[in-house]
């Protein structure tokens, strides 16, 4: 196992973020999307309007989630290449947003919830997160979001066209810290 931490805080956005338009070629030998760094999180948005948008992470391997839906994690549509980017098997034009984990910028966390009690989840940002997005991978759960402006008593419904709603349960009415965030007793974030 190779672990590439700790990492310096980025000084330029291009060190941790790349954007590329795919051509829908679906090649298994040439990456559809490539970044100048090994990306850790990937988001694909359909450029033709409508359709499904996907995201995946190096941590989850060749699995992906629908970003604008509740479906459980699936596989077979994309494949990570550790140094060259993302292979995507589709004939639709997508824009790929690629992110690299970095102190003070972005982290990817996977955990197993317990649904019975609140739980803290560790992260490696080194700063208090301003945005947290959570999606249960095993079943059809909604995407849940926390944002610093809305605070610990609200939940963002990422996959729905809803306003932030009151919820003292989702984040256990607890603000995140520079090392952990808290999930409450709800299946969307703790199952």
Protein language model features and the residues they cover:
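Surface-exposed molecular-recognition determinants
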Residues: 1-191
């Amino acid at each position: 196992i190779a672990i590439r931490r700790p990492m310096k805080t980025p000084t330029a956005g291009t060190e941790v973020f790349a954007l590329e338009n795919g051509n829908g070629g679906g090649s298994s030998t040439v990456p559809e999307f490539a970044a100048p760094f090994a990306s850790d999180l990937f988001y694909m948005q359909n450029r033709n309007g409508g359709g499904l948008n996907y995201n995946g992470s190096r941590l989850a391997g060749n699995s992906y989630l629908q970003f604008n839906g509740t479906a459980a994690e699936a596989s077979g549509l994309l494949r990570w290449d550790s140094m060259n980017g993302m292979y995507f098997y589709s004939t639709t034009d997508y824009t790929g947003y690629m992110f690299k984990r970095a102190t003070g910028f972005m982290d990817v966390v996977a955990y197993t919830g317990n649904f019975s009690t609140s739980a803290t989840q560790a992260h490696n940002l080194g700063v208090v997160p301003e945005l947290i997005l959570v999606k249960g991978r095993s079943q059809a759960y909604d995407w849940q979001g926390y944002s610093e402006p809305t605070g610990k008593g609200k939940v963002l419904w990422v996959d729905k066209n809803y306003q932030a709603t009151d919820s003292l349960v989702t984040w256990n009415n607890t603000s995140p810290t520079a090392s952990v965030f808290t999930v409450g007793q709800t299946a969307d974030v703790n199952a």
